[in-house]
Regions:
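Serine/threonine-rich low-complexity intrinsically disordered regions
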Residues: 8-11, 54, 65, 77, ...
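Generic "edge-of-domain/loop-turn" microfeature
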Residues: 12-14, 55-57, 91
């Protein structure tokens, strides 16, 4: 299951530090960040594309209130973040 999450953040550095500080939870939930970065012209808007190994991992991530508090403390605007499940038919790291 791949999910795209987009939304406002304070700074990428704070967001990235929060992610690194939660590496055990990322492993626990079976998360792999395929992409995480801000828009070139707007450093306060982040896009992440995350692969979850299982639907249970995604559900556990969504239910982790402690993690969401840490995300908010790191400057993630949770109220204005949008999560979009992506289709299973995809190209990944295709180089032609």
């Amino acid at each position: 299951m791949i999910v795209k999450i987009e939304g406002p953040i304070e700074t990428f550095a704070k967001w990235k530090a929060m992610v690194h500080g939660n590496s055990e939870k990322i492993k626990k939930y079976g998360m792999t960040f395929l992409y995480a970065g801000t828009e070139k012209t707007n450093e306060t808007k982040i896009t992440t594309v995350i692969r979850f190994d299982t639907m249970e991992g995604l559900e556990d991530f969504k239910a982790d209130d402690e993690l969401h508090k840490e995300r908010a403390a790191a400057g993630v605007d949770l109220a204005n973040s949008v999560s979009t499940p992506m289709g299973d038919d995809l190209l990944e790291q295709y180089k032609g």
